[in-house]
Amino acid sequence: MWKLKIGKGNGEDPHLFSSNNFVGRQTWKFDHKAGSPEERAAVEEARRGFLDNRFRVKGCSDLLWRMQFLREKKFEQGIPQLKATNIEEITYETTTNALRRGVRYFTALQASDGHWPGEITGPLFFLPPLIFCLYITGHLEEVFDAEHRKEMLRHIYCHQNEDGGWGLHIESKSVMFCTVLNYICLRMLGENPEQDACKRARQWILDRGGVIFIPSWGKFWLSILGVYDWSGTNPTPPELLMLPSFLPIHPGKILCYSRMVSIPMSYLYGKRFVGPITPLILLLREELYLEPYEEINWKKSRRLYAKEDMYYAHPLVQDLLSDTLQNFVEPLLTRWPLNKLVREKALQLTMKHIHYEDENSHYITIGCVEKVLCMLACWVENPNGDYFKKHLARIPDYMWVAEDGMKMQSFGCQLWDTGFAIQALLASNLPDETDDALKRGHNYIKASQVRENPSGDFRSMYRHISKGAWTFSDRDHGWQVSDCTAEALKCCLLLSMMSADIVGQKIDDEQLYDSVNLLLSLQSGNGGVNAWEPSRAYKWLELLNPTEFMANTMVEREFVECTSSVIQALDLFRKLYPDHRKKEINRSIEKAVQFIQDNQTPDGSWYGNWGVCFIYATWFALGGLAAAGETYNDCLAMRNGVHFLLTTQRDDGGWGESYLSCSEQRYIPSEGERSNLVQTSWAMMALIHTGQAERDLIPLHRAAKLIINSQLENGDFPQQEIVGAFMNTCMLHYATYRNTFPLWALAEYRKVVFIVN
């Protein structure tokens, strides 16, 4: 059986190192001897259940580790369930019953180090490049044994669409990019080309013109594999890093994620690296094209993209720049003497940046796309070197196993989920159920704060300060995030107001000051707050977005969600520390409020960048406005936000928004009559922020009834549609959200309806 391990220590692996003894690390191990017949049967039943319902609910319920934790803690619900047939039956007792049942279940899921585990997956282009990299380097079977590979195959099969293709994410229609990547992944994992899944996928690809229509990222990876030719890819010259840093197109100016993707890509492109041409690679050249491989016009193929993948079409200026690099610049840089005088130096510089990122992130890197590229670049530089071995040691940090198989996560969301969990438990006001969990969670947050800036002259490496930050996952990751820092800071401040005997010693004041300093540094002149770094690029740089299937990839920008989190954290901080940077904090909050008001859409909502979508951002926006002292009577933006929510409430009392809202950038209700419990919780809390309980309780009663009646027998809530998002088109499955937010919403509802009133 598979078991989730919460890690301390490195197991004597000399290639693993940590800043805090691996607090928060999550890895999966397979134990052939583990599990009773009943436990193994329960796992198989969970797998069958997902497979049978995979086209109805695309995201897994993340059951394997939950079953393990509940078993280890000998969890029994013990509290009978109460339901409400109408809103008149929603009493203090009914609400408290559902809340207590949910809290009892949720606290049993807390890990020993204080965080709440949970997968963060969804995109179907995460896993294949990892398999490609390990196949090229000859480490596939060394890193992933037969049990790993079986679960990977399960995941790929479970998420194949009925038409034979794979979507950009688990709920998406089929696209060429992910269909090709997952087809090749199946073949590398040993599947026969005539096996049903392969056969249907290959037919989907060929029906749309073959693999020459794959988007740019796909052309890049296929060139590395030797299934495509480098001459058919768009140039990614490493010399861009050698340009003067003041130039607007310098990589140091662009969004950190794109920067950390482009640097290893430019190294591999600059070397025109191609992996071993194995018999399988030769077969793939035959299987994926409509014409003989040797006769393909690669120059023409460079501009061919499947219509299913096109979200962001290249503007003319980008194509002109690409043509100039391809036809005039690259021929010079790849010939003597410039190949020695310039290209070699550029390649050395890119590796310097790669090693810097690797060391400062403990070889986790900023995310899974970058991880694989950096790992492959290290192997190309030195196949037997320690850099590559250190990368191999951190692969388990990215892998996750559930009833739908093994997948690769974007990276962990340990801190993010834990911050929300603590706030939900605090709101529940059930100390007999939550005190121990709050203390453990407090310890995790304290242990996870980044205590220093990146090493050395970090500004010359285009990094921002990180001292005082919290990351999305754990301290070892190292990358500061504004909203993660704000949510963790809120937790520290809220817990500091409680007895240390209950929740542990509060964090040092200086560490709080460091966090405030970081948050203030990430605010732009327009009042909005960026996610990772201050804005360095002009907005027009988005014209050079090299992907066809994502948007907003080039420029660090301000986000309503981040801005709201920071308002709430700074407002709480100034109440507890009124003399620390008082004027700066007050001014920061004023500007942030103005930014939120300025970014409201005509229908009263706000666009969500990190969740689905308008409901998500509206919850944040109204929470930020309320924290800053805005009220329904005095603030037009708040009244318009309330109007949006009340007019989108469904007949069952809940809310449901389609993930298509993210790409279409307009509110689109989800299909069918069923509401989404997580989105219902966001909307419910947003209304509570605005004082809805003082105006009309009926919308809140209706939403509470839906949440209470949807609770499962054991205190869990059902998994529904995907609700996380990034870069307009990519969706993320946060499995823990289905517990955190319904509990939090019920807690806030109980407080304002039955306790305050």
Curated annotation (Swiss-Prot):
Residue spans of the PFTB repeats? 149-190, 589-629, 638-679
CDD domains named in the record: SQCY_1
Keyword terms:
Isomerase, Lyase, Repeat
Record keyword Membrane present: no
Q: Which SUPFAM superfamilies match?
A: Terpenoid cyclases/Protein prenyltransferases (SSF48239)
Disulphide bonds annotated for this chain are none
The record's annotation in PROSITE patterns points to: TERPENE_SYNTHASES
Superkingdom of this protein's organism: Eukaryota
Q: Which residues form the active site?
A: D483
Molecular function, one GO term:
lupeol synthase activity
| Coiled coil location | none
Which reaction(s) does the protein catalyse, per the Swiss-Prot or TrEMBL entry?
Answer: lupan-3beta,20-diol = (S)-2,3-epoxysqualene + H2O; (S)-2,3-epoxysqualene = lupeol; (S)-2,3-epoxysqualene = beta-amyrin; (S)-2,3-epoxysqualene = germanicol
Its Gene Ontology cellular component terms are: lipid droplet
Q: Which GO terms describe its biological process?
A: triterpenoid biosynthetic process
The record's section on InterPro entries has: SQ_cyclase_C (IPR032696), SQ_cyclase_N (IPR032697), Squalene_cyclase (IPR018333), Terpene_synthase_CS (IPR002365), Terpenoid_cyclase/PrenylTrfase (IPR008930)
Listed EC numbers: 5.4.99.41, 4.2.1.128, 5.4.99.39, 5.4.99.34
Q: Give a Pfam family name.
A: SQHop_cyclase_N
What functional role does this protein have?
Multifunctional enzyme that converts oxidosqualene to lupeol and 3,20-dihydroxylupane. Minor production of beta-amyrin, germanicol, taraxasterol and psi-taraxasterol.
Name the protein family: Belongs to the terpene cyclase/mutase family.
Protein name stated in the entry = Lupeol synthase 1
Q: What is the lineage of its organism?
A: Eukaryota, Viridiplantae, Streptophyta, Embryophyta, Tracheophyta
The gene it comes from is: LUP1
